[in-house]
């Protein structure tokens, strides 16, 4: 589509849907190629319990929002297999480092990965049973097949198809 980029923004951050629906305090990042569009979206989306910050790093915010799901699958698998905090921290930390390198190679800003869209979303997604990707990974770690884990999952685990994209991006960069 040949549409003006300043008409679009993406929103990402540590936003487990159940907690947002319960109006628990949360924050996110609105990113647009246009700073004024990002600021406008952030202003419209901010409430008394939901704070939205503006960014022009669309590549970084979008990559954080999707790629962290692959790390959450891996953390879930480690938990399902019976491993503890050290293993989870290792996977999250190395995962963040590798996602940051991949993002920077694709044109993202490294600091985006250290903010709400990056480490914030990663912590929420990798550490909560409310996370579909974490739960899906935990079921795989317990020995379920992908088909079995899909049947018992509550919603789509975006990290499963995203894994192939991460491999392709890694080969490209």
Predicted regions, residues:
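Short, flexible turn/loop "capping" segments at secondary-structure junctions
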Residues: 19-24, 116
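Glycine-/Pro-rich loop/turn segments that contact NAD(P) or position catalytic residues
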Residues: 1, 12-21
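Short beta->alpha linker loops
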Residues: 11-15, 58, 117
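NAD(P)-dependent Rossmann-like dehydrogenase/reductase catalytic/cofactor-binding core
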Residues: 55, 68, 72-79, 83, ...
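Internal alpha-helical scaffold of NAD(P)-dependent oxidoreductase catalytic cores
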Residues: 2-8, 25-112
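Short alpha-helical
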Residues: 15, 36, 131
């Amino acid at each position: 589509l040949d549409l003006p980029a300043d008409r679009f923004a993406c929103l990402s951050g540590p936003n487990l849907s159940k907690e947002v629906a319960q109006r628990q305090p949360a924050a996110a990042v609105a990113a647009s190629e246009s700073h004024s569009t990002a600021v406008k979206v952030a202003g419209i989306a901010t409430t008394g319990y939901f704070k939205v910050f503006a960014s022009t790093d669309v590549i970084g915010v979008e990559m954080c929002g999707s790629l962290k799901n692959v790390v959450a699958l891996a953390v879930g698998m480690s938990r399902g297999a019976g491993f503890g905090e050290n293993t989870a921290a290792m996977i999250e930390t190395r995962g963040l480092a590798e996602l940051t390198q991949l993002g920077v190679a694709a044109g993202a800003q490294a600091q985006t990965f250290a903010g709400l869209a990056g480490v914030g979303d990663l912590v929420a997604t990798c550490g909560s049973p409310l996370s579909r990707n974490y739960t899906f990974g935990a079921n795989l770690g317990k020995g379920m097949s992908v088909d079995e884990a899909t049947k018992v999952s509550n919603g789509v685990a975006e990290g499963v198809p995203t894994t192939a994209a991460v491999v392709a991006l890694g080969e490209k960069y």
